[in-house]
Amino acid sequence: MNYSLFISCAKGLEYLLEDELKGLGLHVTQVSPQGVYGEASLPVIYNLCLWSRLANRIQLILFSGHAAKEQAVHQLCTDFHWQTVFTHDKTIAIEFHGASEQIRNTMFGAQIVKDGIVDHFRRLNGSRPSVDKEKPQILIHAHLKNDILTVSFDLVGYSLHQRGYRKKAGKAPLKENVAAAMLLRAKWPELAAQGYGLHDPFCGSGTLVIEAAMMAAHIAPGLLRQDQSLQYWARHQSSLWEKLRTQALQQVKPLAVKLVGTDTDSKVVALARSNAERAGVLPLVEFNTLSLNACRPGTKRGLVVCNPPYGERLGEVTQLVPLYQQLGTTLHTCYQGWQAAILTSSPVLAKALGLRADKQYTLYNGPLECKLYCLTLSAANKLKNTPNAPLSDNAQMLFNRLEKNRNHLQKWARKNQITCYRIYDADLPEYAYAIDIYNDYAVLQEYAPPASIPVHKAEKRSLEMLQVVPRALGIHPEKLIVKQRKQQKGSEQYQKIGKTSQRQIVTEGKAKLIVNLYDYLDTGLFLDHRLMRLKFAQLEQGTRFLNCFCYTASASVHAALAGALTTNVDLSKTYLLWAEDNFRLNDINLSKHQFLQYDCKEWMKTTRDKFDVIFLDPPSFSNSKRMSDILDIQRDHVSLINMAMRLLNPDGVLYFSTNLRQFKLEPMLKEKYAVQDITPQTIDQDFKRNSKIHHCFKIVMPHFADN
């Protein structure tokens, strides 16, 4: 007897799946983007469940019929002989997909199907199956399209990518059947038969290496699965099933070489070993903690297969370019005679490899469209797009501009004891970056390109940027840090973007300051306010100085070194602790200074303290949950300035600054106070190209205004 089946798969794998299923004995009747339809006997069905490496689900088609309305769906499900599929004492669940004019909700559709099944059994013997949505013994699929209802029984009960060996995964897990597809596209079974080795330098939890070992050793992926729905199928033949399982176990064969996985994260390497042990392939594989540039082949011939990180946003993509350049260099230098298969969603990262692909295949990692690039690593496949490759005409213009800026600003920075400064700020509009130097590091902040710029053009410019910057500035590629600068909303301004906690010390005049180039979009030091900070370095000893919205209190460090007594207010405990570290770094006695964690607006309303100098530099916008209200600097600057002026001694000075480019000072403030726009005096040499980086005002009471 033959059964009608539908075997689903990940998008893009349908024809690869068709070949696999034909090899396992399925008579294919139709191929669709969702999967493969076919006819199979019971032994073939069991072999599909045991041996398919690519399938998601294997569904036994039970019946189909016209059913536009609720009553028709219920009638079809009541009339079907469910006792030929399972008995009433089994637990069930329904997955419903599709809709009609009357049935628009999948939960409602599932309820109708379930009611039909229950009513059938009640009429048959007065009993009914129970529903278990979490772990049913019988999973029924119902699909309604064009008023045709198709109902099927899930023979395994869950997706076949769940082999049973992976209890935990790394940050970006690759599904087992997608990993298997990568290996099949890379011709791994044929290569393994010839004694080739295998190496995954980004192994994570080990999925690719484990799947490769199971293929090479001819281990059926279904052997590890427990509690499958076919065990509860009324037509299940346990003796035949066990016979085929035994035959599968007998087909396992040894490997001539160990397959290798490496990763820089020791925790995921340990996880990979645990997964390999559960899969029964631990003797066939080897997992080590190793950096990419330390990777070396263990055999003369082999396959490098990997799923490196490939960020989904443009800023993430460009930050990964150096990693892909290093991968290309390592493959070309150390893996001659090998094959390679590399999965990425980004053409710019594929290009950054600098190696020519023989073939490309489209695969989907979840919803993300990716390309698998298959390469032959040989002397004929020359390495391109390396840091030393010839520059395009546009890239050469960028190089010339950076070199010119470097020659000018380096001398100025040395003369003024400055080790952190802006060297480039979208000087050439097509290369929309700001580049800041911190000692021997460069932080590249990529302005989000307008929607009118095609993604491939933006990515090409990004790749050229990363090619040019190390060469023009004499900076090692590993010391480039790429971030994407965009208009920030709410708490985004201070949100973490990483967890490296790598700090550095920079110099600014007499002050030493701590910066973190990795963990946040901002580094802990606003370079454009340097001249304001240096102005505070000239305060008289004993000056009472308030730094409101103090951030890491770098301005206060300069003031304290001059002998001022500082009060530093900020809502963030993280930044206040950072501020205290800045003070300690400069051997400043903390007992003479205050670090207060408050909502600055609320604190200014209630404090009775008075100050000689106040620096007020609020964010342009903030909606932090810990604030009593949303801060919008254009709307709120009048009240903030009034509150700050209340805290000044009669002859005191308020310096108000904002980075809101379109900021307009409310005219009434000039009627109430003596206001001087000192923005030009606060723009240092490295920001002359972008004089609108901030607005700065000196505000005093009218009778203390400068004559």
Curated annotation (Swiss-Prot):
Subcellular localization(s) per the UniProt record: Cytoplasm
SMART domains to which the protein is assigned, alphabetical: THUMP (SM00981)
Keyword set, alphabetical order: Cytoplasm, Methyltransferase, RNA-binding, rRNA processing, S-adenosyl-L-methionine, Transferase
Catalytic activity reported: guanosine(2445) in 23S rRNA + S-adenosyl-L-methionine = N(2)-methylguanosine(2445) in 23S rRNA + S-adenosyl-L-homocysteine + H(+); guanosine(2069) in 23S rRNA + S-adenosyl-L-methionine = N(2)-methylguanosine(2069) in 23S rRNA + S-adenosyl-L-homocysteine + H(+)
SUPFAM superfamilies for this protein: S-adenosyl-L-methionine-dependent methyltransferases
Enzyme class: transferase
Keyword RNA-binding: yes
Superkingdom of origin: Bacteria
CDD domains, per the entry: AdoMet_MTases, THUMP_AdoMetMT
Any Gene Ontology CC annotation: cytoplasm
GO MF annotations, alphabetized: 23S rRNA (guanine(2445)-N(2))-methyltransferase activity; RNA binding; rRNA (guanine-N7-)-methyltransferase activity
Pfam families tied to this protein: Methyltrans_SAM, RlmL_1st, THUMP, UPF0020
Signal peptide residue numbers: none
Domain THUMP span(s) in chain numbering: 44-155
EC number of this enzyme: 2.1.1.173, 2.1.1.264
Function summary: Specifically methylates the guanine in position 2445 (m2G2445) and the guanine in position 2069 (m7G2069) of 23S rRNA.
Similarity field: Belongs to the methyltransferase superfamily. RlmKL family.
The protein's name: Ribosomal RNA large subunit methyltransferase K/L
Species this chain originates from: Legionella pneumophila (strain Lens)
Gene from which this protein is expressed: rlmL
